[in-house]
C-alpha cells in the first residue's frame, strides 16, 4: 500500500478535508457515464447474471426443504417493495426541501434466513461452491432434482470440506447459516464491530466464531490466512469475489419484475434513483450492476456511507481505490452502522463500477438512529442503523439544483421519478437490541 501524504491529497482533493472533519458530504461523480461506456470495465455481463439466476432456480427446491420459511416464495429469496409516504412527508419537513417523486423501501431487511441483503450474495456463493464440489465428485448434475442435497449422504460429503469468511456481521450470518445447513464446517472471523447477538445466533447454528479486537480488514486477512493452511477450506473473499457480486446482481431483474407488477414505469421521463448503503462495496456494487443491466441509463445509483467509514467515496473520489484506507487520514472507522464499518473499499468493485455510479454521500451515526426512530414511528418498520443510510439520499439530490440541471432533470421529470431506498438489514434484530436503537433516536 502507498504511503499517503495527507496534505498533498487534500490540496488535490479538497473534499477529503471534509471527510477528515467527519462532515456529512454529498459528491456527484463526474466519471458517471452510460451503460455502454461503463459496462466493459466490469468484466461481467448479462449472461453471467442469467447464469446466477438459473443456479438459484436449480437450488429453489432444495431451499424449500432446508428452509421451510422459503416455501411461500417457492425457494427463491426475495423481499417486498413498499411505499413509505408518511416517512416522505416527515423528511420533506425535516430536511426543508421537497422530494416530489414516489418514495419506496426495498425490504432486504426482511429477507428469509439471515434478515439482510447479505442473504443474496452470501447464500449464492455457498450454493455455487457446493454445486461445484458435488458435480466434480460425480454426485450431482444440473438436471437433477436438487432436493437430493437435503440428505445425510450429502451432509457427510460436504462435511469433509470447510468454508471461512471475514465479516462485520451480516455476511457471516448468511454464509454461516447456509454452510452449516449443507453440512460444511464453517468459521466466521468477526471484527470488533460485530454485534453479540449475531455471534450468538451463528454459534446456535454450529458455526465456529473467531472474534477480533480489530476491524473488518484484520478479520478478513486472518480468515484468508487460516484458509490457506487447509486445502479443503474455501475462503469467501468479500473484497474481491465476483461470485458474491453476481449473487447480488440478480436483484436488478427482480426489481424490474416487481415494478412491472406494481405498474411502476422506468424510462427517460420516469427516472429511477436507488440509494444503497455501502460497506466494502460487494453488496451495493452487485445490486447496482444488476439494476444497470435491468434499467440501463434510466437508473441512477448512489452509495451511502457513515461519516466515520467513507471508504468507497474516498477510494473512487481520489482514484486510489483499495490503495487508501480511511485510517490513513486519521478517520477511526468506528460506527454504530456495523455492516458499514469498513476502512478500505473493494478495489474490484470500485474499479468495476466507478463509471456506473452517480454519486456518494455520508451521514452521521446519530442521523441513522434518528431516521431509524422516525421510520419505526411513521411506518412501523424497524431496521438496524446501517439500513437507514440510504434514507436521506432523495433529499441530497433534491437539494442539489446544479447537479439536476447538469443531468437534465427538470422539476416535471423529478415529480415523475421513483426513489428506492435499499433497507439492508434489521429484520432479525432481537427486541431488546431494537429497544436500545429506538432509545438512541432523538426525534
From Swiss-Prot:
Reactions accelerated catalytically: D-serine = pyruvate + NH4(+)
Sample GO molecular function, one term: pyridoxal phosphate binding
Modified residues (N6-(pyridoxal phosphate)lysine): 118
EC top class named in words: lyase
Alphabetized UniProt keyword annotations: Lyase, Pyridoxal phosphate
Superkingdom: Bacteria
Coiled-coil parts of chain: none
GO BP terms, alphabetized: D-serine catabolic process; isoleucine biosynthetic process
Named cofactor requirement(s): pyridoxal 5'-phosphate
Classification via InterPro entries: D_Ser_am_lyase (IPR011780), Ser/Thr_Dehydratase (IPR050147), Ser/Thr_deHydtase_PyrdxlP-BS (IPR000634), TrpB-like_PALP (IPR001926), TrpB-like_PALP_sf (IPR036052)
EC number(s) stated in the UniProt entry for this protein: 4.3.1.18
Pfam families: PALP
Family: Belongs to the serine/threonine dehydratase family. DsdA subfamily.
Protein name: Probable D-serine dehydratase
Species per Swiss-Prot/TrEMBL record: Aeromonas salmonicida (strain A449)
Amino acid at each position: 500500500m502507498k504511503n499517503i501524504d495527507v496534505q498533498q491529497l487534500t490540496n488535490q482533493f479538497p473534499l477529503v478535508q471534509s471527510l477528515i472533519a467527519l462532515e456529512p458530504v454529498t459528491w456527484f461523480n463526474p466519471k458517471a457515464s452510460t451503460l455502454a461506456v461503463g459496462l466493459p470495465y466490469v468484466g461481467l455481463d448479462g449472461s453471467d447474471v442469467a447464469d446466477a439466476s438459473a443456479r438459484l432456480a436449480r437450488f429453489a427446491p432444495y431451499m424449500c426443504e432446508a428452509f421451510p420459511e422459503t416455501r411461500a416464495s417457492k425457494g427463491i429469496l426475495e423481499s417486498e417493495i413498499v411505499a413509505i409516504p408518511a416517512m416522505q412527508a416527515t423528511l420533506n419537513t425535516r430536511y426543508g426541501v421537497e422530494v416530489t417523486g414516489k418514495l419506496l423501501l426495498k425490504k432486504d431487511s426482511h429477507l428469509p434466513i439471515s434478515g439482510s441483503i447479505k442473504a443474496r450474495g452470501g447464500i449464492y456463493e455457498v450454493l455455487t461452491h457446493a454445486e461445484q464440489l458435488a458435480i466434480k465428485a460425480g454426485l450431482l448434475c444440473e438436471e437433477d432434482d436438487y432436493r437430493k442435497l437435503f440428505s445425510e449422504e450429502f451432509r457427510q460429503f460436504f462435511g469433509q470440506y470447510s468454508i471461512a469468511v471475514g465479516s462485520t456481521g451480516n455476511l457471516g450470518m448468511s454464509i454461516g447459516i447456509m454452510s452449516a445447513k449443507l453440512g460444511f464446517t464453517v468459521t466466521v472471523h468477526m471484527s470488533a464491530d460485530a454485534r453479540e447477538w449475531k455471534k450468538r445466533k451463528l454459534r446456535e447454528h454450529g458455526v465456529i466464531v473467531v472474534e477480533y479486537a480489530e476491524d473488518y480488514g484484520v478479520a478478513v486477512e486472518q480468515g484468508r490466512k487460516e484458509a490457506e493452511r487447509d486445502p479443503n477450506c474455501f475462503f469467501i473473499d468479500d473484497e474481491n469475489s465476483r461470485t458474491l457480486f453476481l449473487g447480488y446482481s440478480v436483484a436488478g431483474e427482480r426489481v424490474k419484475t416487481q415494478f412491472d407488477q406494481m405498474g411502476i414505469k422506468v424510462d427517460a421521463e420516469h427516472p429511477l434513483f436507488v440509494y444503497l448503503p455501502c460497506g466494502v462495496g460487494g453488496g451495493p456494487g452487485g445490486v447496482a450492476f444488476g439494476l444497470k443491466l435491468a434499467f440501463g441509463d434510466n437508473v441512477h445509483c448512489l452509495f451511502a456511507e457513515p461519516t466515520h467509514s467513507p471508504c468507497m467515496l474516498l477510494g473512487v473520489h481520489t482514484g486510489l481505490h483499495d490503495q487508501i484506507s480511511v485510517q490513513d487520514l486519521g478517520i477511526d472507522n468506528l460506527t454504530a452502522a456495523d455492516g458499514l464499518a469498513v476502512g478500505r473499499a473493494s478495489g474490484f468493485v470500485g474499479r468495476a463500477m466507478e463509471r456506473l455510479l452517480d454519486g456518494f454521500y455520508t451521514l452521521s451515526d446519530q442521523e441513522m438512529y434518528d431516521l431509524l426512530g422516525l421510520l419505526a414511528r411513521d411506518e412501523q418498520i424497524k431496521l438496524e442503523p446501517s439500513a437507514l443510510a440510504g434514507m436521506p439520499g432523495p433529499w441530497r439530490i433534491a437539494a442539489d439544483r446544479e447537479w439536476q440541471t447538469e443531468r437534465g432533470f427538470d422539476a416535471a421529470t423529478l415529480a415523475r421519478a421513483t426513489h428506492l431506498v435499499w433497507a439492508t438489514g434489521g429484520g432479525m434484530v432481537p427486541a431488546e437490541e431494537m429497544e436500545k436503537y429506538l432509545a438512541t433516536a432523538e426525534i
